[in-house]
Structures are given as C-alpha cells and as structure tokens.
C-alpha cells in the first residue's frame, strides 16, 4: 500500500501527459458507460474483451489535503486500516470482540489527552494488552484471503494529496463476489489492530526517509506550497504519527467515505449490462450522506522571487518553481504542452538539448496541477567535468535553464519542435489506450477532478488548436512571473529514528468468520480458459543467427521495433559506456548530424529511439509512425553504423565519464545501491557486478574510438528482431533486411548469462554496518535445485503459500502479527533456462532495533514452516487465475514466445499448468518445502545501524558474524 511521496510529481506529470493527448478514434471509447446510483455513487464501466481479467477500483475524493492540520497522516493511515475488515469480515465473534474494540478507542482518547511520558507508556501497554485480547476474536488477514479465494491479484491501495484508491484485478466470472466484498468493506468497517498497524506505517515512513530524494522533494514542496496541505508529506508528520487518534480516524472515514464522494471503476473483460444490477444490489446499499464544505486554503505567496538552499542531495541540482494552475483551469492543457517543449520523451525539448550538448548532466520540466493549486517545476543537475572531477556551478546551471525558458517567453519557438511535441502527445495516448490500467487512471482522474469524461476525450482537438501565440502568451504569463529557486547541494539529511515500541505481538487464531462461509455461496459465472495464441506471430530468419518476429498491431498506427543483440556487459564491460554515448551522440558524415539534429529528424518522422544494455543484451528500441518505418529504420541504421562519439574538447565523452564519476561518488551514500551491492556480493562473491566492472581509472582513460569499437563488436552477435505493427510481415521484412546492422555469420550468443554463483553450503551471517540507515535491510538466501518446467507449478504453489502477498506466511507472521516490517517477502526465483539452479530469496525491511527478532521469526518459518492445509483451495484458485491472466501485450508477445522457447515450452504453459494446478494438494507444498528448504544452509545478510542491532542475540542463535565493508563491495 504505497504512499506516493517520492514520486508524486512524476505521477501527476504522467497523468497530465495522458490527458493532454486524448483523441477520439473509432472504437477507442466503445464499451464506456458512466452513471450514478441513487445514493450518489459514481459508476464508470469500460468493457475491453481483449483483456484476460477485470481491473476493479474504488476511488474516494479525499486525500491528505482533507486532513485536520492537527492530525496529519489520517488519509494514508485509513488506507491501511480499510484492509482490516468490518463487523462481519475478519471477526470470529463480533459480540465478544466489540467491547474490546470500543475499549481500545477509549484508551486512545485518553492517550491523546495525556502528556506525561510514563503515563503515556502505561496507556500504550494497556492498549497492547486489550488489543491482544481483541485479536483472539479476529482474523485481520481475512479480506486478503477472500480476494485470493476469487483469484484476485495485485491487491493494493494508494493515498495521494487529493484521493485514496483501492484496487486489484480479478476474473470476470467472479464479478458478483468482488462487488459484494468491495462494497461490504465500506459498511461498518472495524479498525482492529490499530496499534500494530501503526508500526507498519512507521516502517513505511522509515523506508522513504532512507532516500535523499524524499528529503529533497519534501524541502521543495514545503516552500512551493507554503501554507497549504500540499506542503507536507502525505504520510504525515512524525509527531502526529506518534500521537495517533483512533476516533479522529473513524470521524475522517464517516466524513469523506460517502457515496457522493466515491466512484466504482471496472475496466476489462466483463459485460456492463450484466454488471449493472449487481452493482445496484451491492454498492447501492451504501447510505447517502451529505458532504461537508471543504477547507479553503490561501494561495501560496508568489509575489517576489525567493531563493532557498539545503544540503540534501546525492548530487547537486537546481530546481525552479513557478506558480501554475489547478486541474481543470483553462491553461492546464496549454502548460502541459509548454513544459513538453522544454523536455519530452523524444529528447527534442529545449532543456533536453542542454543534456545532448553536454552542458548539463540531467534536466527536466513538468506541469504539476492538483485539485487546489498547481506548480510548474524545472530542474537540472550540473555538468560534471571528468578532468577536474568537479561539477559546474549551480548558478551557471540555473542560467542555462533560464536562457532556454526565455526563448519561449520571447517567442523564439521552432515550429518543428511544436509539431514534434504535438505528435508525441497523440502517440502517447494511442499507446496508453493499449493498457487497461491506463484506462482506469483516465476514469479515476475524471472522477477525482470532476472533469467530464466526454471533455477529456475531446482534447485532441484542443491540442491541435494550440498556436505559437498561445505558447508565447503562456510563457510570458507564467515564466516571466516571480519564481522560487532551490539550490540543492550534496549532503546527508537528518533522520528521525524512532525507538522500538514495547508491545507484544498479536496472536490471532487461524479461523474464518461466518461471512467467509456465506461468501462461498455467492453465485459465480463459468471459467472459460483463454490461452495465448502465438500463431499470429510470423517467425523467420534472415541468417542463421538473425531471427525476426513480426506481431500484428490491430489497435493503432504506432509500430515498435526492438533489436536484441545477444551480448551485454558481462562479456563486453565497456559496452555500458558505449550505450550511454549512443544516447547522446550524433551521426558521422559530411555534413553529418549532431545528437540534437539526429533526434529532431526522428521526431519529424514521428519516432524516437533509445539504447540500453543489460549484462546479457544490447537493446535498441524504436517506436514511431508506421508510414515512416523505412525512413526511420534507415536513420537508426546510420546512427548504429556511424555514431559520432567525438566532439570538441571531448565534451560528450567527458559527460559520460563525469556521470560515472558522479555515480561512483554517490553509490556509497545511497542505501538501495549499497544494499544491492551487498546482495550481489552474497550471491556472486567476486563475480558481483559492482566488483567485476571496469575500474574508475579505466573509465576515465576511455577513448571515443575504443567505445565505437566495443559497440561494433556487439553488433556482430546473434540478433533477435521483434516487430509489432500494422504492416504485413513480408513488407516489414523487406524493409528491415539490409537496413539494420546484422551479421551474416553472427557470433553465437551465450545469453542470458548464467553468472557463477557463490554457493551457500553452510550457514553464514554477513553484516554491513551503516549507522546512517533509517531502516535496516535483511536478506536470506538458500541454494535450490536445477530448474525443470515439470516442477513449475510446485514452485508457484510454494511461493504463493510462503510469500504470496498479504495472504502469504511471511507477511502474515512478520507484518500482520508482529508489525516488524512494511515490506517482507520470500520466493524461489525462476531461471530463464532449464537446468540452471534456482535460489530462494527472502527479505525483511525493519528498524534496526527489531532486526534480531525479525531474523528469529523468519528463520523459524524456514526451519519449521507452519501448515495450514485449508488454504489449498485459495491457492489453487489464485494460481489458476494467475497463469490464465499472465498474458503479454501484443508488443511483448514475441519476446514472451522466445523466453518460453528457451525454457522448453512450445505452447502457452497455462494449457498444461491449469490441469496440474487442479490436481495440486497441500501435501505437494509440504513435500516441496521439506526437499527444497527445510534443513538447507541459509546465508543471512544484515545491513543497518550497528548501535541498534542486537548482534549478541544474532551471534548466539546463528553463529559467527562476518562483517563487510562498503569498500569491499565496490571496485574503484
């Protein structure tokens, strides 16, 4: 249940971009229905029978903006609590549970009025005692178990500034059960295990604060939205989290979770006419209530230029904020367009050119419109001079950004750029309409911001009508106005570490409510399995080592083309830097093309191209207008064969070197990168990607000719060509043949790479001390057996039982019962090729002072797995739906085919697995556990604060602790 803190700006930007590019084409809005129930609930239905399942959401127009200022975090905490059930769901005996629940509410009232620390601690202890008694009559995991019982997947929720959403996917034949369950959760909810869940919220809080970008965004938002609820974290202030008010939570629910403030959204494979009476029968039961008047916040002061500075970043950056507009303003769409003239996915924006010209390292621009206010945000990271190993100054970087903005203000606007951005908007909508999740997000946005869907679906014409005069008017109005500028220097933010609470875990019995039994009697439809049909993929070979796959696109005019060369950084380490150069380089020749000119030419053709690399593959991804396929492919071919890596004063090459120097300076400060490097070391030893990579000195000594040589070496390898588009396969192949780099006698690929792994042949504990971490990270590793597709269902069944989301043992024992973690998991990885060794990977993210206890609990699950045979029916249902709904989009269909072929499948595995799942018994899971997990050596990796982790307890239980140092994990 993520709270969107770090990525709020990105999410708003993506939604804004989606809304900018909407267009009506035949069939795109077919099956869309919107209406209201008598109680005021909005219903939005969109049939899409190309999908294998249904996306079901409930949306409430209430977020952190609606919280009392003295009780921040309520909206997000309520999101957590709405998974705990009702007076019927999740209770084994409501008559016995109810007085205990009401006692807990009263105790929290007393706690809120108590200031003496000792008295507060005594009340917290009392709350824990009563909560433990209450837990004897509850089953807090019942809601997730019920979702599992209908084959539901992706159970989740999120809270933003303006809304709270709950969602999961499910098979269409289970529609009535899903509607019943999602409506019942809103009738008399019970916020049981309030104290325990608060600890999980704290763990979520800890997780975000270990990322410096969270601190940067909070600092920027705090000033951009000063005096407004948007200025604070969605998760709430720590002082409010420490002083929770259960009654305020109940009041918040009663106030905002009313039908007139909510929407039900269904998108996917269902019949809307059949759904309507079921919706009336279920959601029609919700009682209508009036909505209160929402608080009116004052406008943040933008009357003068202001500057702010802080040492918070992994790297220096400048951010510039202007006053924007709220959602629905007449200029919202125009500002989306204007900011895309500065930065866009085609890399042809004015700020993008600064990156391509190596004047800055990174640059961005976004229009962040929200319900109440909006901001325009620009930013850049200075160029890093590899020769001096110094960043350019922030003032110099700021000046570069402002100079580009001034071009818009003065009307110095390239009409080709405007045309390219317009085309990007149109294409982006066509692409997003391929995904049911994005259709849901469109409907969600329509409801939350009260914008009629009909208007949103007419915005193509509005985009087409934007003129140069409109752009200049908006640029003058918004960019010539006062701004707030932020100079972010490198630094280490202060962290507020919270002590482990003195509470005992909940010990609920394993049981089911009467509701569960009645739920099983609700009628369902009939499962009609639909398997993947690969017969529409045209498979051919240009040469022995050059394989081409063509998949039809019947939805739009945008093709996608992936070139997948069978070599990566494992065999050619310097290919990482050659790939980076490709993304900022031009084309040799007379006259040739600069990087900006190359991308501008692609944009004129309605196309974009990106290069990437993994340890196994060098990838070229091209996307564009079908009618220009030949010209686009020819242009990319020219770039691949004749890239111009040289530049005046080697600024391009120095930019790549500077980026690598900057990254290596940052990596020991970034807890996620440190954890990844430590995990790589535990798994691969000296074969860790962080150890076997080129040294920094080797990178700094690179030449452009060396990188060009490494690139062309990669182009000699075996090649897969994956095309998805509307043109006939024969025509496509005639276009591609001879117009792409392909070797007649290609080097055979060894990919996907199977790196030699460090064996786990004895119990071992690794410890990486890091006193800066807000949240410790604990990993578990067990060697498995050579993988066979004959065992695929057994692997899936064990993974679902042991680590399957909210219903799995790991989350239930560690999060639900003991509140030790926000995130915890455990599963066997599936290798990409049969015969390669599997591995069990487990994880717990928790406060350092909880680590020793968390390790004990996790190890107890590995040593003596609890057995609940009654769960097998849910597991069968879940797995059956999982394999049936695991269908690729048409753009990824041919790559799914090749990956299945590598595993040894000739058809959709679901055709075999559905029958195997039906025969599955709990004894199969138990036998798998005993042969693959129980008694096996376990490697444990702990990363966290050495002052808070109880190393004595860990050593006493698991033996010698091997300490690691960061210097050992990274090569320099």
Give the label of every model feature segment.
Residues 2-11:
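Positively charged n-region of N-terminal signal peptides that target proteins for export
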Residues 11-22:
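Sec-dependent N-terminal signal peptides
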Residues 26-45, 271-310, 317, 347, ...:
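Proteolytic maturation boundary segments
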Residues 46, 51-64, 73-74, 91-184, ...:
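M16 family metallopeptidases and their MPP-like homologs
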Residues 184-192, 283-290, 402-413, 637-647, ...:
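A common structural junction motif
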Residues 196-198, 214-215, 219, 229-240, ...:
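Hydrophobic, small-residue-rich alpha-helical packing segments that form membrane-like cores
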């Amino acid at each position: 249940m993520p709270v969107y803190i770090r990525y709020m700006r990105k999410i708003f930007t993506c939604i804004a971009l989606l809304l900018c590019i909407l267009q009506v084409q035949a069939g795109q809005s077919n099956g869309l229905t919107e209406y209201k129930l008598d109680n005021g609930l909005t219903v939005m239905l969109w049939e899409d029978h190309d999908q294998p399942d249904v996306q079901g959401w409930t949306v409430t127009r209430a977020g952190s903006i609606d919280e009392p200022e003295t009780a921040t975090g309520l909206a997000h905490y309520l999101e957590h609590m709405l998974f705990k059930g009702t007076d019927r769901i999740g209770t084994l005996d409501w008559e016995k549970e109810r007085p205990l629940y009401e006692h807990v509410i009263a105790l929290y009232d007393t706690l809120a009025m108590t200031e003496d620390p000792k008295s507060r601690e005594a009340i917290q202890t009392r709350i824990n005692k009563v909560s433990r008694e209450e837990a004897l009559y509850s089953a807090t995991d019942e809601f997730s178990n019920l979702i599992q019982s209908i084959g539901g997947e992706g159970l989740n929720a999120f809270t933003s500034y303006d809304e709270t959403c709950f969602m999961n996917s499910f098979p269409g034949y289970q529609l009535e059960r899903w509607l019943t369950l999602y409506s019942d959760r809103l009738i008399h909810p019970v916020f049981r295990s309030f104290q325990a869940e608060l600890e999980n919220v704290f763990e979520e809080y800890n997780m975000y604060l270990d990322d410096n970008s969270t601190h940067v965004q909070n600092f920027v938002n705090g000033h951009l939205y000063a005096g407004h609820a948007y200025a604070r974290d969605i998760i709430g202030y720590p002082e409010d989290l420490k002083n929770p008010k259960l009654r305020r939570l109940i009041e918040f629910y009663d106030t905002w979770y009313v039908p007139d403030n909510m929407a039900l959204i269904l998108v996917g494979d269902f019949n809307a006419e059949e759904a309507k009476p079921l919706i009336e029968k279920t959601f029609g039961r919700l009682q209508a209530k009036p909505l209160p008047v929402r608080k009116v916040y004052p406008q943040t002061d933008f009357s003068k230029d202001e500057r702010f500075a802080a040492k918070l970043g992994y790297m220096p950056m400048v951010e510039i904020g202007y006053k924007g507009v709220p959602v629905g303003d007449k200029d919202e769409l125009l500002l989306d367009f204007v900011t895309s003239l500065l930065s866009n996915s085609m890399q042809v924006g004015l700020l993008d050119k600064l990156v391509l010209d190596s004047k800055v390292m990174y640059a961005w621009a976004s229009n962040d419109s929200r319900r109440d206010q909006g901001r325009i945000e620009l930013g850049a990271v200075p160029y890093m001079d590899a020769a001096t190993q110094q960043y350019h100054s922030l003032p110099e970087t700021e000046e570069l950004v402002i100079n580009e903005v001034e071009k818009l203000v003065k009307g110095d606007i390239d009409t080709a750029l405007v045309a390219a951005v317009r085309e990007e908007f149109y294409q982006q909508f066509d692409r997003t309409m391929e995904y049911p999740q994005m259709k849901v997000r469109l409907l969600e946005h329509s409801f939350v911001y009260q914008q009629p869907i009909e208007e949103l679906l007419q915005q193509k014409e509005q985009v087409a009508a934007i003129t140069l005069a409109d752009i200049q008017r908006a640029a003058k109005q918004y960019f010539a106005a006062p701004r707030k500028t932020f100079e972010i220097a490198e630094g280490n933010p202060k962290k507020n570490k919270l002590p482990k609470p003195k509470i005992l875990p909940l010990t609920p019995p394993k049981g089911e409510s009467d509701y569960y039994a009645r739920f099983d009697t609700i009628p369902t439809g009939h499962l009609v399995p639909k398997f993947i049909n690969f017969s529409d993929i045209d498979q051919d070979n240009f040469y022995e080592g050059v394989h081409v796959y063509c998949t039809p696109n019947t939805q739009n005019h945008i093709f996608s083309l992936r070139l997948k060369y069978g070599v990566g950084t494992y065999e050619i380490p310097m290919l990482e830097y050659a790939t980076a150069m490709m993304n900022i380089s031009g084309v040799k020749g007379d006259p040739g093309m600069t990087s900006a000119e190359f991308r501008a030419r692609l944009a004129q053709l309605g196309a974009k191209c990106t290069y990437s690399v993994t340890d196994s593959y060098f990838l070229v991804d091209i996307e564009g207008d079908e009618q220009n396929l030949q010209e686009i492919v020819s242009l990319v071919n020219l770039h691949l064969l004749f890239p111009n890596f040289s530049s005046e004063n080697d600024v391009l090459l120095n930019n790549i070197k500077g980026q690598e120097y900057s990254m290596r300076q940052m990596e020991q400060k970034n807890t996620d990168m440190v954890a990844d490097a430590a995990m790589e070391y535990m798994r691969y030893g000296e074969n860790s990607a962080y150890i076997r990579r080129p040294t920094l000195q080797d990178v700094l000594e690179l030449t452009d000719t060396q990188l060009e040589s490494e690139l062309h070496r990669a182009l000699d390898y075996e090649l897969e060509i994956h095309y998805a588009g509307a043109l006939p396969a024969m025509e496509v192949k005639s276009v591609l043949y001879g117009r792409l780099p392909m070797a007649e006698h290609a080097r055979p690929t060894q990919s996907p790479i199977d790196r030699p792994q460090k064996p786990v042949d004895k119990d071992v504990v690794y410890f990486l001390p890091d006193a800066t971490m807000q949240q410790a990270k604990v990993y578990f590793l067990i060697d498995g057996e050579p993988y066979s597709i004959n065992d695929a269902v057994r692997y899936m069944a064990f993974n679902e039982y042991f680590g399957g989301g909210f219903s799995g043992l790991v989350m239930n024992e560690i999060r639900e019962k003991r509140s030790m973690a926000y995130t915890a998991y455990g599963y066997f990885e599936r290798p990409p090729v049969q015969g390669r060794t599997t591995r069990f990977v487990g994880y717990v993210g928790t406060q350092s002072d909880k680590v020793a206890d968390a390790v004990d609990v996790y190890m107890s699950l590995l040593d003596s797995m609890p057995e609940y045979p009654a769960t097998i029916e849910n597991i069968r249902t879940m797995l059956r739906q999982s394999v049936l709904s695991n269908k690729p989009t048409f753009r990824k269909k041919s790559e799914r085919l090749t990956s299945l072929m590598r595993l040894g499948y000739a058809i959709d595995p679901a055709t075999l697995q559905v029958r195997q799942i039906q025969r599955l018994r709990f004894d199969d899971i138990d036998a798998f556990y005993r042969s693959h997990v129980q008694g096996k050596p376990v490697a444990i990796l702990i990363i966290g604060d050495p002052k808070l982790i109880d190393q004595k307890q860990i050593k006493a239980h698991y033996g010698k602790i091997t300490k690691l140092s960061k210097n050992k994990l990274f090569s320099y």
